[in-house]
A protein has these predicted regions:
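Blade/loop signatures of beta-propeller domains
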Residues: 17-43
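A short beta-strand motif characteristic of beta-propeller blades
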Residues: 42-46, 81-86, 121-127, 168-173, ...
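Short loop/turn segments that connect beta-strands within beta-propeller blades
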Residues: 76-79, 116-120, 163-167, 204-208, ...
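Repeat-blade elements of multi-bladed beta-propeller folds
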Residues: 18-24, 49-72, 86-113, 126-160, ...
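Short cationic/low-complexity microdomains
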Residues: 327-347
Length: 368
């Protein structure tokens, strides 16, 4: 029964037409309950101070994101008008986590901020780590109570569980290098995160300790996606991995060419879809690890693709375009020219695509 309850909690975000955190929900599967726009048109543009390299979250009628000038923004989803903003002391590359009316986001100043999602006021004083926070936060319930934890890694080599009510540390796990990925949370209470130690760490939330290390052979710049006991991720080893998290040996590895993966994968029932620095998106059979299709752009694809409910796969490229392709075949539906490098990942909800770019703008794309 406990596993069922946790599964329902983790999946709840995926059934709402929102995008409240990195990859849409704690399993980081990159799935949206919204259909992609049929004929893309620009709805609005918001000018931030510096490049927006992480991405946005969408909750209710608002959009949340940070920029490299260190500003956290809340703007209207319908019109792109600023609602509130908060200046931090360094760049903000993380994607906000919106949970129970609070915006949680880390910054390169080493702090995790908890802000009222409506007003922007601080819920509690920022939680301080020993170094910058570039990864986005996730969340889970305390297995022993109804309390909730924000889970986030830092460049101080530590992974933290923080009480959402108080902002106090509940526990932490120390690693041997920088942590730069968002933790993926499995239905049975495991958190998986990677970093510059070339490992995917598996932490038991119940035991509050690391129980396993998965060898990624090189540093892990992005996040894993999990489904059941399976985890999928890429690394600087130029490979994509599929692990059963109960075992330290991979089920399969995929290597196409000698390029790294700085993108987090999206999962369908059959495919793992991930961007690469060979300027392509790769679709890999979940069971066999064999290539199913690739789609070529004219720039690196660090953007993490999003799978929409109508089967569309949406992602950005450093060639300055947003692409929409058929997830089953890789056939292009449409492309939209922004004209500036896109390293950030799309947030998709209510038929709208919200994405940041290196020109300091956030773009909202909808249907004609």
């Amino acid at each position: 029964m406990k596993t069922l309850i946790l599964t329902i909690a983790l999946s709840a975000a995926a059934f709402a037409d929102e995008w409240p955190m990195h990859r849409g929900g704690p399993m980081l599967q990159g799935r949206s309950e919204s259909a992609a726009p049929a004929k893309p048109t620009l709805k609005w543009t918001f000018k931030a101070g510096k490049p927006v390299v992480g991405g946005a979250s969408i909750a209710g009628d608002r959009v949340y994101f940070g920029d490299n000038a260190g500003v956290i923004y809340c703007i209207g989803l319908s019109d792109g008008k600023e609602v509130w903003s908060l200046k931090t002391e360094s760049a903000v590359e993380a994607i906000p986590l919106i949970l129970d009316g609070t915006c949680y986001i880390g910054a390169a100043d080493g702090r995790l901020y908890a802000l009222d999602a409506i007003t922007g006021k601080k819920k509690w004083e920022p939680f301080e780590t020993g170094d910058k926070i570039l990864a986005s936060a996730s969340w889970a319930k305390d297995p022993a109570s109804d309390k909730k934890w924000v889970l986030v890694g830092s460049y101080d080599f530590s992974f933290y569980a923080i009480d959402t009510a108080t902002g106090k540390q509940v526990w932490k796990v120390e690693t041997e290098n920088f942590i730069n990925s968002t933790p993926a949370i499995t239905a049975d209470g495991l958190a998986l995160f990677g970093g510059c130690d070339a490992l995917m760490h598996v932490v038991s939330l119940k035991e509050q300790k690391e129980i396993r290390k998965l060898d990624a052979e090189a540093y892990v710049p992005a996040s894993a996606a999990v489904d059941g006991t399976m985890a999928f991720f890429g690394s600087d080893s130029k490979k994509v991995y599929a692990f059963d998290v109960t075992n330290e040996k991979p089920v399969w590895t995929y290597r196409d060419r000698n390029f790294s993966y700085f993108s987090s994968p999206a999962l369908s029932s059959e495919l793992v879809m991930i961007g690469a620095r060979d300027k392509r998106v790769h679709a890999i059979d979940r069971k066999t690890g064999e290539a199913r299709w690739t789609f070529a752009t004219k720039g690196d694809v660090d953007s993490s693709p999003v799978l929409c409910k109508d089967g569309a796969l949406v992602f950005g490229s450093m060639d300055g375009r947003i692409y929409c392709v058929e997830s089953g075949t890789g056939k292009e539906r449409w492309r939209y020219e922004i004209g500036s490098d896109i390293a950030s990942s799309p947030a998709i909800a209510k038929g709208l695509i919200v994405i940041g770019a290196n020109d300091g703008n956030v773009y909202c794309i909808g249907s004609e």
